[in-house]
From Swiss-Prot:
Means of activity regulation: Ubiquitination of histone H2B to form H2BK123ub1 is required for efficient DOT1 methyltransferase activity on histone H3.
Other comment: In contrast to other lysine histone methyltransferases, it does not contain a SET domain, suggesting the existence of another mechanism for methylation of lysine residues of histones.
Organism: Gibberella zeae (strain ATCC MYA-4620 / CBS 123657 / FGSC 9075 / NRRL 31084 / PH-1)
Ranges of biased composition (kind: Basic and acidic residues): 11-29, 90-100, 112-121
Gene: DOT1
Protein name: Histone-lysine N-methyltransferase, H3 lysine-79 specific
Database matches in Pfam families: DOT1
EC number: 2.1.1.360
């Protein structure tokens, strides 16, 4: 293409003047964990916010399963072991390139539920045009075979063992979600690298009470003295192990929630909401990952260093920081992920922002897993009663993909995890950015603008069409290292 080189190059510019603004992202210090106090373990504190119909989240409890559990710290640690190493827990099965301590993303799950995607305190930003409720989820029931039940991946058939002293014919339970959809099947069992049914069911109950109900409606669930959550935690305590008590509390939860759904309470509350708490977004995405990618994560190890086929993930907190706080995306906008892997970021943008979300990937195994995730994503959103943005997943080379090129013309935010891209591919991307509309943001791990003038004409084009800002991400934001690093937000001039 003579446009970018040779005598006919029409881009004649002065040496690029690059504005670099370093933005330090402060990571909230973790609060020290209080010493266990059985009398207070179920207590709840209420938020003073008034825009949501939901109470402030309860303090998180550790799993009381008598066996080692896939605790939050391991579930949220995205610096995953390579497939050749034994896996920690379902949601922990991410590709890892070094060994670091657990729990680096723990603060991600302890964010205040009532905080407007963190923007309430920082910027007051809310997207009033987002319609969060899925009408279909409250009008029709999907076939229970449309989604992957927990029992399909963690059961007696999968060599798991019963917990709480249950006999084999006592392990089956079902869990109601905040919609008309079928209840999910679980078994009260434990197995290495398997879904912990005790922990998972308590978390679902807690998320429903915190997000979908007003304080008054949530009282039967959150009351520290005999509320359903308190009873579930007490019954599953390793020193008590009350199987019948646990199942009775879960049955009561199912009945009360279904009554609230049938009475239109859940739908009414969702209609007043315009966003989901970040920790619920992460929980739903992890449910999807656990039932799809985690089962076949070894397929992602087939990459080659020094090529454009290296696999790595940007984690939930990173994406929330960029899409919610920095670029302030809204549900009416368009997001494009170039090199979308298994689709994690595409799905997060659609769920957390509600925007039209595009992704393109050329690695076959990653594409196949992305399709599996999308199918489960659609079903899980129905279970939770929420309507995400439209998701489009494309296969192949994004440089040659016509739908992606059309989407780029409308894009408001483009993400390129180009940390391991070859220089040729990065150069080709700059050419593609000529079609971006003015004001479009390009988020990347490497800058597309050279720091110093050189003879590489493509960098002259980058400085001509992009204004770049350098930012710093803290530790625990990417899958391939625990260390922090730089990323760039470029704006199309």
């Amino acid at each position: 293409m003579r446009l970018f080189g040779g005598k006919n190059n029409k881009f004649k510019v002065d040496p690029p003047k690059i504005r670099i603004e370093k933005v330090v992202v402060d990571r909230p210090a973790q609060k020290p964990k209080p010493k266990p106090n059985p009398a207070l373990s179920g207590s709840a504190s209420r938020s003073s916010s008034s825009h949501h119909p939901s109470p402030k989240p309860l303090a998180r409890q550790a799993s009381h399963s008598p066996y080692p559990s896939s605790c939050d710290e391991k579930r949220l640690e995205r610096k995953r072991k390579a497939p050749s190493v034994s896996r920690k827990s379902p949601a922990s099965d991410r590709i890892e390139f070094d060994k670091d301590s657990d729990g680096e993303d723990d603060g991600w799950m302890t964010l205040d539920t009532k905080r407007q995607r963190k923007g309430t305190e920082d910027s007051g930003f809310v997207d009033p045009n987002r319609k969060l409720r899925s009408v279909r989820a409250f009008e029709e029931r999907m076939d229970s075979r449309k989604f992957i039940h927990a029992v399909d991946v963690a059961s007696l058939e999968h060599k798991c063992v019963p917990v709480m002293g249950a006999q084999k014919d006592e392990v089956a339970i079902r869990l109601q979600y905040p919609s008309l959809q079928p209840r999910e099947k679980y078994e009260l069992v434990w197995g290495k690298d398997k879904i912990d049914a005790v922990e998972a069911s308590i978390k679902v109950v807690r998320h429903v009470a915190e997000t979908y109900l007003t304080e008054e409606e949530a009282e039967p669930f959150t009351n520290p003295n005999g509320g359903i959550i308190r009873r579930l935690e007490k019954a599953s305590n390793r020193n008590i192990q009350d199987l019948m008590g646990f199942k009775a509390a879960l049955r009561e939860y199912n009945e009360k929630l279904r009554a609230l759904v049938d009475d239109g309470v859940i739908a009414k509350n969702l209609d007043k909401m315009h966003e989901l708490p970040q920790h619920l977004v992460a929980f739903i995405l992890d449910q999807i990952y656990d039932r799809t990618v985690a089962l076949k994560v070894e397929l992602l190890s087939k990459y080659e260093n020094g090529t454009d086929y290296v696999y790595g993930e940007l984690l939930h907190p990173f994406i929330s920081k960029v899409l919610v706080e920095q670029t302030r995306m809204t549900s009416g906008q368009v997001f494009v992920d170039l090199g979308s892997g298994v689709g994690n970021v595409v799905l997060q943008a659609a769920l957390e922002i509600g925007c039209e979300s595009w992704g393109c990937e050329m690695m076959e195994n990653a594409c196949n897993l992305a399709e599996e995730q999308k199918k489960e994503f659609d079903a899980r959103c129905m279970l939770w009663g929420v309507r995400p943005g439209k998701v489009h997943l494309e296969r192949g080379d994004f440089r040659k993909n016509a739908p992606i090129h059309e989407a780029l013309k409308r894009a408001d935010v483009v993400l390129v995890n180009n940390k391991a891209f070859t220089s040729q591919l990065n150069d080709d991307l700059v050419r593609m950015f000529l079609d971006l509309k003015s004001g479009c943001k390009v988020v990347s791990l490497k800058s597309f603008v050279a720091e110093k003038s050189n003879n590489h004409n493509i960098n002259d084009v980058g400085s001509t069409i992009l204004e770049v800002e350098e930012c710093i991400y803290p530790e625990g934001y990417v899958s391939w290292t625990n260390a922090g690093g730089s990323y760039f937000i470029s704006t199309r001039k």
